[in-house]
């Protein structure tokens, strides 16, 4: 914008200079004609007309000189202002170009380290890479490379996102499976606690039953002992009766033998 305004001022100044040159040449021509007329003293009206034209031309030239001087001053001031604007615009353009290179390099570093934490050394790396980037990449090519880098970053980001989604799904599935196993574990723990309580109860019953059995055994042993004692007493009485019976039987047998002998003697 500033360069266009500067060219317009320069064009306008050149046009005024050309106009001044034409008028100057015309003035010199008319002045020559006037001098020639004065030398011959002919055609007074023509001379007066030329004098008037000369006066008008002189005034016009004076005005043009004044305008030109003022125009040059204004033009110089305008040129100075426009040159300042041009320098500022150039500085801004250079800053934008540097910013474009920095953006490109920053994206390149981002793509290279996608998913990792921000490296504080990136700014130093960018400063070190800037000269090589400016040498190898024209300013008009930075935008295209930046777009390509952004596309690459988008692709990498999409891959990372898909990987994260896959891992998230795996984690969710694992959590669901963990919940199922935890529920089963709780059920098993409940069952184990029930079985443990039942086992303790059975053990208590077994201990109680064992105690009762021991008591029963003791009672049975006592009864057995008493029974044995009674049996021994009964066996003692039976032996005594058997001995008596045995003696009676012997006496009876002796008597029978004696009777048989007496009968035999009588028979004889």
Curated annotation (Swiss-Prot):
One GO CC term, this protein: nucleus
Coiled coil: 171-243
Function of the protein: Plays a role in meiosis, germline development and oocyte morphogenesis. May play a role in DNA replication. In the germline, involved in the maintenance of transition zone nuclei and in chromosome structure and organization, but not required for mitotic proliferation.
Segments of this protein annotated with the region Disordered: 229-268
Location(s), subcellular: Nucleus
Gene disruption: observed consequences: RNAi-mediated knockdown results in embryonic lethality in 10% of animals. Surviving animals have a reduced brood size and abnormal diakinetic oocyte morphology.
Claim: Iron-sulfur is one of the keywords in the record: no
Keywords recorded for this protein, A-Z: Coiled coil, DNA replication, Meiosis, Nucleus
Name assigned to this protein: Protein atz-1
Extent of Acidic residues compositional bias: 231-268
Statement: the UniProt record of this protein carries the keyword DNA damage: no
UniProt record, GO biological process: DNA replication; meiotic cell cycle; oocyte morphogenesis; positive regulation of brood size; positive regulation of chromosome organization; positive regulation of DNA replication; positive regulation of meiotic nuclear division
UniProt superkingdom: Eukaryota
């Amino acid at each position: 914008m500033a360069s266009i305004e500067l060219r317009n001022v320069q064009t306008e100044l050149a046009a005024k200079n050309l106009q001044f040159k034409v008028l100057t040449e015309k003035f010199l021509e008319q002045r020559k004609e006037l001098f020639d007329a004065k030398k011959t003293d002919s055609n007074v009206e023509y001379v007066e007309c030329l004098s008037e034209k000369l006066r008008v031309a002189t005034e016009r030239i004076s005005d043009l000189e004044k305008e030109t001087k003022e125009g040059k001053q204004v033009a110089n001031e305008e040129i100075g202002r426009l040159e300042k604007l041009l320098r500022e615009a150039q500085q801004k353009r250079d800053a934008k170009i540097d910013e474009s290179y920095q953006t490109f390099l920053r994206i390149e570093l981002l793509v290279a380290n996608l998913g990792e934490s921000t490296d504080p050394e990136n700014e130093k790396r960018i400063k070190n890479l800037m000269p090589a980037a400016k040498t190898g990449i024209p300013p008009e090519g930075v935008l295209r490379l930046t777009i390509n880098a952004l596309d690459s970053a988008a692709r990498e980001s999409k891959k990372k996102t898909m990987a994260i989604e896959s891992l998230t799904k795996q984690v969710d599935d694992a959590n669901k499976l963990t919940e199922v196993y935890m529920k089963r574990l709780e059920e098993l723990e409940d069952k184990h606690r029930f079985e443990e309580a039942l086992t303790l109860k059975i053990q208590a019953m077994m201990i109680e039953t064992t105690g009762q059995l021991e008591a029963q055994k003791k009672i049975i042993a006592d009864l057995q002992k008493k029974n044995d004692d009674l049996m021994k007493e009964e066996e003692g009485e039976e032996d005594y009766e058997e001995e008596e019976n045995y003696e009676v039987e012997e006496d009876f047998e002796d008597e029978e033998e004696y009777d048989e002998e007496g009968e035999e003697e009588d028979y004889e």
